[in-house]
Amino acid sequence: MCDDLTAIDEDLALASKGLSRRDFAGLSAAGMLTACTTTEVADAAATRETAVAIATPDGTADALFIHPAKGRHPAVIMWPDVAGLREAYRQMATRLAASGYAVLVVNHYYRAAKAPLLASMAEWRSPAGQEKLKPAIATLSPANTVKDATAFVAWLDKQAAVDKRRKIGTQGYCQTGSFAVRTAAALPGRVGVAASFHGGGLVTPAPDSPHLLLTKTKAAFLIAIAKNDDARAPSDKAALQAAAAAAGKSAEIEVYNADHGWCTLDAPSYDKAEADRAWARLLALYSGL
């Protein structure tokens, strides 16, 4: 989770690279993302990007829809991390689209403001950034996630770039790892794969804890856990494995050799090697949509 202990781990990761948090924040978004560029896709498809507005029961959600310029493709809903929809996630969605997917990367904070609320993960780690996000975070709830996911899937199924004959994938990061699971549970007829990267809140005491929802899904799961998250909640992986087994679901549940945030391009803990490994597992599962 993105808590004070995670911030300490991030400081240590930056120090190992010879950077302070001030140094990291001072890097331009373009420069940081260039430095963190992940492996390019062989024979990548040309993509098309559109800023879209999607009607939901609570208003209008802004999002980016990025897909190959030609043809119909399986759809994917990408839920950004705690810092919200921003340049890092636009680049991540573009990379996925270039692999042959119609990607909707959403602003899950739309009830509070249009994206980007923050420019980078570094801004989230500042007192001003955290204060700015408080009202937006307060709008989140399991019920709202389900409403939004239902609206997003309905919208995707109307798009010419989406192949409705194929299942939908969904992936979440940090706090939205649980959103991916809830999406799969709410729309079992459409969601074929759900992935959580350094996700939080997957195992809770609540009766609607995400791990208890696996029985309501028809999806395969990729649960990629950060090593520092695992150190703080070592029993979660076993609970997830037991829940998947009880539900009869295919689930890759693994603790990666990287810290919370390692898959997000502009995170201090970004780890290219482990991010690429997780990305390869994601594409392997998505190939079956």
Language-model region placement:
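Short beta-strand element of the alpha/beta-hydrolase
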Residues: 73-81
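C-terminal catalytic histidine-bearing segment of alpha/beta-hydrolase fold enzymes
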Residues: 248-289
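Gly/Ser-rich "nucleophile elbow"/oxyanion-hole loop immediately N-terminal to the catalytic nucleophile
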Residues: 121-169
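Short beta-strand/loop motif that positions the catalytic acidic residue
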Residues: 217, 223-225
